[in-house]
A protein has these predicted regions:
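Metallocofactor- and cofactor-centric catalytic cores in central/energy metabolism, strongly enriched
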Residues: 1-154
Length: 154
């Protein structure tokens, strides 16, 4: 592993202004955009990080997730997909519901697909139909356990 192991490839420069209105100043009570250069360290051991720095190595890190000020895709022309994998966990329907609500109401994405039964739902030979996820479909799913999409392992 080296410092480029977890780099995320991009499709091009993000030139569209994000439709969500966030802050720029820490401590103003408004969630801030994430800058592209923000990273999360892979290694949590202080001694290991110091060793990398002394050897003039860039510590291994992940791109920090979160909303960006500029985005690549035009939300009104975007289709989004959600898939749940690796088994069930508490609150999965809450996560699905939150993603749909954020995409639909904050970003303006109108076509959101839910792929059933984990990665199998992405493979045509299994013939698992996708579910069109709208605010109406997901309105009360947080009241139920499991995942509206199902899941699979392996």
């Amino acid at each position: 592993m080296n410092s480029s192991t977890f780099n995320v490839q991009t499709l091009g420069k993000s030139t569209l202004k994000s439709p969500i209105q966030l802050g720029y100043d820490k401590g103003d009570g408004i969630y801030n955009y994430i800058k592209d250069e923000e990273r999360i360290l892979y290694e949590k051991n202080y001694t290991s990080i110091l060793k990398d720095l002394k050897e003039k190595k860039t510590p291994i890190s992940f791109e920090k997730a979160g909303p960006r000020e500029n985005i690549f895709f035009e939300p009104s022309k975007t289709k989004a997909g959600i898939v749940t994998c690796g088994g069930l966990c508490p609150g999965l329907n809450n996560v699905i519901r939150s993603i749909v609500m954020e995409l639909y109401y904050r970003y303006g994405v109108e076509k959101i697909l839910g792929f059933q039964y984990g990665f199998e739902g992405l493979i045509g030979k299994y013939n698992h139909p996708y579910i069109e996820l709208t605010p109406e479909v997901i309105d009360e799913i947080h009241l139920y356990g499991g995942s509206i999409l199902g899941s699979s392992r392996g």
